[in-house]
Structure formats: C-alpha cells, structure tokens
C-alpha cells in the first residue's frame, strides 16, 4: 500500500478488476463503506463503466460535476461506493445500481429509477430526550421512532434520504445474501436460528433450488414478496 493507492493484486476480492494490467489502483477514501464492502468511484467509472481510459480523464469528468452518487454530485475520485448505491450520469441519461453477484464481486446493473435506495439498519443509538438514531449500512444516520429494529431495511427517497417504506427482518422476508459462499443468492427467510453462545446466529433461506443456511450478518432484507428496488432480481 502506498498513500492513496494499493496494489491491484491485493485489492479486495469484491472488486471486479484485472489484477495484472498495472501495479497500483486507487485506495477508497474512508467513509460510508469499508474497503472490502466498497470501491473507489474511479474504479467504477474507468474499470467497470469505461467512461474514460485513465484517472486523469476521470478526475476531469468528476471535477465538472457530471457524476452523481445517490443523487449528489461527487468530485473526489476516491469517493467510496458500495452495496445498493446508485451512480448516475445525467449527460447520457444513465443510472446504475451497485449489487453483489453470485461470484462475490460487485456488479453495476442499469436502472431507470434512481429516486429510491434500500438500506439495512446495522444498529441503533439512544440519544438524549428519548430519541432513537438509526445507523444504516451506507453510513447514513437519521432520527426515527423506535418502531425500527436492527437488521430491518428501509427504502429511502433520494437525494433527501427520507424513509418511504419499512421492511422487517423476520421469517418470510425476502433477502439477499451479501457475503460468503452464497453471496448474491436471493430467497425467503425460513428460519432464524438464535445461538446461545459467542457464535453468530444463522438463517435458513429457502429458494426454488432448495434451502441453505448462512450467517445472519450476511443477510440483507430487500422486500416482502419481490425486490423493493430496481436492479435486484429474485
């Protein structure tokens, strides 16, 4: 690792990039997503969308305010994008949602609607005055009622980030697995196994191909009977 860069061969496995074309790749800036669960905007634009051939051209495009992430202009080429973020390029009327594939890597799926985003509640914080702060998987924080539980998901209207819908984490919920050997698979929660030890809870998920079990923290609620946002196919 060197300053704002890291070696391509050491880049997270979630990044769908070639490893031997050059030695270095931009390191994502600290922010909403971890390095393993996010990637720098320059990688998205240059390596995945191929809107330019090199970092200098990408920096120019970003400096001109031509790229939005979740409805907001982003100009830092190292800005971190991750799961269910939406990248928009108004000049070509294009929107893409970041999803995890069954290969364990990030993919960009074209979408027509960039006005909604699904977020997972990773934890809650009790504030003074009895207020509750929701902490979401993309770093968003917001004040809400205590009706929301950790591991539930909410649909946010973008770019104002206001809650529009709420999906509970429970038996029957439609979920996507975001990590592990079942990464990218979608199914319904059949059983939640609570472990009375330091080991993680597990979830049994049913799909048309059969049932499988995965770690609870790998599960992301995406709707009830069908995915609640574009770009995710059950």
Curated annotation (Swiss-Prot):
GO CC terms of this entry: cytosolic small ribosomal subunit
Molecular function GO terms recorded: rRNA binding; structural constituent of ribosome
Ribosomal protein found in the keyword field: yes
Entry's transmembrane regions: none
Domain S4 RNA-binding: 39-102
InterPro entries: KOW, Rib_uL2_dom2, Ribosomal_eS4, Ribosomal_eS4_central_region, Ribosomal_eS4_central_sf, Ribosomal_eS4_KOW, Ribosomal_eS4_N, Ribosomal_eS4_N_CS
Taxonomy, superkingdom: Archaea
CDD domains per the UniProt record, alphabetical: KOW_RPS4, S4
A biological process from GO: translation
Keywords, sorted A to Z: Ribonucleoprotein, Ribosomal protein, RNA-binding, rRNA-binding
Pfam family, one: Ribosomal_S4e
SMART domains in UniProt: KOW
PANTHER family with a match to the protein in the record: 30S/40S RIBOSOMAL PROTEIN S4 (PTHR11581), SMALL RIBOSOMAL SUBUNIT PROTEIN ES4 (PTHR11581:SF0)
Family under the similarity heading: Belongs to the eukaryotic ribosomal protein eS4 family.
Protein name: Small ribosomal subunit protein eS4
